[in-house]
Amino acid sequence: MKLTKLLTYLMAEPVQNDFHDPDITSIEMDSREVRKGSLFVCIKGYTVDGHDFAQKAAENGAAAIVAEKELDVDVPVIIVRRSQRALSVLSDAFYGQPTKQLQLIGITGTNGKTSTTHMVDEIFKKAGRQTGLIGTMYIKIGDETFPVKNTTPESVTLQKTFKKMNDEHVDTAIMEVSSHALSLGRVHGCDYDIAVFTNLTQDHLDYHKTMEDYRQAKSLLFSQLGGSFNHEKPKRAVLNADDKASAYFEKVTAAHILTYGIENDADVMAKQIEISAQGTSFELVTPKGTKQITVSLVGRFNVYNVLAAAATGIAAGLPFDTITSALEELQGVRGRFELVNHNQPFPVVVDYAHTPDSLENVLNTCKDMTEGKLFVVVGCGGDRDKTKRPKMAEIAVRIADEPIFTSDNPRSEDPLAILRDMERGVEGTYYHSIANREQAIFFAIANAKKGDVVLIAGKGHETYQQIGNETFDFDDAEVAGRAIVELNKK
């Protein structure tokens, strides 16, 4: 694509250095990836400023550079107010606005995004759709998966992925949309058809600072649905009637709204809920029909995820029988209330719960399954919201019988300092502190007996532990498996 054509989407022109309207061969935000013909966009990140690498990009063959200020380089420079937003617009244009050829479903919220995204994917596949998925665990196009760095990729990677979905004849894309991606503008240019809200509880306050700012960031997904009423590509918002943030989201969108819930009156509801260690049964009540269903997932929090997925299917006009059939065939998502079974006499659960609300939910579910003692291994991430550390500890001590505090990606922080932050919330109470996560897991499993339950919280599907500047292989389920094998030898 010619540079002048690409710049029409920005309504911008080069203001520094002459140019001869080169062909743009790629869009890059990493100077190391720049080749002859690349358009380099300078992004100011948390620790690195792309403007500092503009000269390197020029030396590597950049045809032009997008920046927020003038630069000392010999290639054309396009100055914009916000280069992150410009990157989104340019990426969308460069790859041919690929989301216009998809039914695009965005799912946002503090907890439940990953589980709900996978449930929606299963429902749409059951309906005969060719699906793509973008989320915390991976990117999936058809049956092929690719690794990810962020819950929501950078905009150039995102649009490139959507273009690949177009090429692979995908018709429906389901994606997790993080608050970071929304506030940074990574998803500008994405033509969402259905926006889904799970819940809003404390998380990411290291970035958003206040819950109001956090809510505002989440609301951008719903305002991004636009104000038009296109019957060929209708817009829908799916909101949790039991979460007070939904009232705010309802105000910022012109899209048709479908609600779901358990407590408050909603379009899609679960009634007569019965939860056991084997699964959950309830009456699914919807505008399309009512049916008693049983899912293999455990916990009230999972009922909300199922309702959100069902409401999304209804919002898309899928047959009710297809939706319920897909839900009843659901398998668990890795790291989300994942049972680790090596013939030990007690359940061991691995779960991604890393916020106060999600930890309380999963602990209460485990408590209902516990005849003896409830063990929980839990930590708090380094370089993240410090205010939730004492809250997480208080919840663990209040609900569990054997709370064990440990490390969970301490990053640049001292693991012992993180533990001290947690302990400030539970002074004078009973708990264990074991900084080494592997030792903490082994301790819990070695001391559990028949009738007990062991919950390993915080990392879920993650297969690494970040300590300092290094990343080590670490998988809670694998470590738990080894601990159980050791226990079984005794």
Curated annotation (Swiss-Prot):
Pathway: Cell wall biogenesis; peptidoglycan biosynthesis. The gene is murE. Pfam families: Mur_ligase, Mur_ligase_C, Mur_ligase_M. GO terms for cellular component: cytoplasm. HAMAP family: MurE (MF_00208). It catalyses: UDP-N-acetyl-alpha-D-muramoyl-L-alanyl-D-glutamate + meso-2,6-diaminopimelate + ATP = UDP-N-acetyl-alpha-D-muramoyl-L-alanyl-gamma-D-glutamyl-meso-2,6-diaminopimelate + ADP + phosphate + H(+). Belongs to the MurCDEF family. MurE subfamily. Keywords: ATP-binding, Cell cycle, Cell division, Cell shape, Cell wall biogenesis/degradation, Cytoplasm, Ligase, Magnesium, Nucleotide-binding, Peptidoglycan synthesis. GO terms for biological process: cell division; cell wall organization; peptidoglycan biosynthetic process; regulation of cell shape. GO terms for molecular function: ATP binding; magnesium ion binding; UDP-N-acetylmuramoylalanyl-D-glutamate-2,6-diaminopimelate ligase activity. This is UDP-N-acetylmuramoyl-L-alanyl-D-glutamate--2,6-diaminopimelate ligase. It is found in: Cytoplasm. ATP binds at G109, T110, N111, G112, K113, T114, S115. Its cofactor is Mg(2+). It comes from the Bacteria. Carboxylation is probably crucial for Mg(2+) binding and, consequently, for the gamma-phosphate positioning of ATP. The lineage of its organism: Bacteria, Bacillati, Bacillota, Bacilli, Bacillales. Its EC number is 6.3.2.13. Catalyzes the addition of meso-diaminopimelic acid to the nucleotide precursor UDP-N-acetylmuramoyl-L-alanyl-D-glutamate (UMAG) in the biosynthesis of bacterial cell-wall peptidoglycan. Its main location: cytoplasm. InterPro entries: Mur-like_cat_sf, Mur_ligase_C, Mur_ligase_C_dom_sf, Mur_ligase_cen, Mur_ligase_N, MurE/MurF_N, UDP-N-AcMur-Glu-dNH2Pim_ligase. The modification N6-carboxylysine is found at K218. UDP-N-acetyl-alpha-D-muramoyl-L-alanyl-D-glutamate binds at S31, N150, T151, T152, S178, R186. A motif (Meso-diaminopimelate recognition motif) lies at residues 408-411. Meso-2,6-diaminopimelate binds at R384, D408, N409, P410, R411, G458, E462. Signal peptide: none annotated.
